[in-house]
């Protein structure tokens, strides 16, 4: 089986394909998630404090998601077995998120406009990788699109700008990604 999740894991049985195809599809899906979130965060890091500020809210949401999954874990004695989560070590994930929030808050102090330091590609790709890893480990890959909606909007603005410009020669936004459009 393969699991697709939004708020709760939903098994997707690939009986005709067997276990090997399920593993291959999972690996492709995981690589797609990590690549997408890393690049989305990297695109968002073009404005002082934007990637760090948005990431604080994303990791805050994942702190609550992981803690809720700890409370509703299948290993808890008086939990409804039909509505429990089988996430491995959710409390550790919540602590990891809280540590990232603290680190980003300290970083944001020096990165707010006018920025004295910046995280660069290494920092933004690491933040995107952390979002991807958390979404995979908590089995909330599709919910991550809602939680990190600003990252998705930035990527979509760049894709729309490039696609429309190649097709018509006209720009939809004065500048892409979206946060640079609002600067002008």
Predicted regions, residues:
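Alpha-helical transmembrane segments
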Residues: 1, 23-184
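Extracytosolic (periplasmic/ER-lumenal) interhelical loops and adjacent juxtamembrane/interface segments
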Residues: 1-19, 75-80
């Amino acid at each position: 089986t393969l699991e697709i999740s939004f708020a709760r894991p939903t098994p997707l049985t690939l009986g005709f394909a067997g276990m090997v195809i399920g593993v291959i599809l999972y690996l492709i899906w995981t690589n797609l998630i990590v690549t997408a979130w890393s690049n989305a965060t990297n695109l968002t890091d073009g404005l002082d404090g934007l990637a760090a500020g948005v990431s604080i809210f994303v990791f805050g949401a994942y702190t609550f998601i992981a803690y809720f999954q700890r409370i509703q874990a299948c290993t808890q004695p008086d939990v409804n077995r039909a509505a429990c989560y089988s996430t491995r070590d959710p409390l550790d994930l919540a602590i990891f998120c809280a540590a990232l929030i603290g680190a980003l808050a300290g970083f944001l102090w020096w990165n707010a406009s006018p920025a004295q330091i910046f995280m660069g590609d290494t920092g933004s790709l690491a933040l995107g990788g952390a979002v991807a890893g958390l979404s995979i480990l908590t089995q909330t890959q599709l919910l991550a699109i809602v939680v990190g909606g600003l990252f998705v909007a930035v990527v979509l603005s760049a894709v729309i700008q490039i696609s429309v410009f190649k097709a018509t020669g006209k720009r939809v936004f004065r500048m892409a990604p979206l946060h640079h459009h609002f600067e002008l």
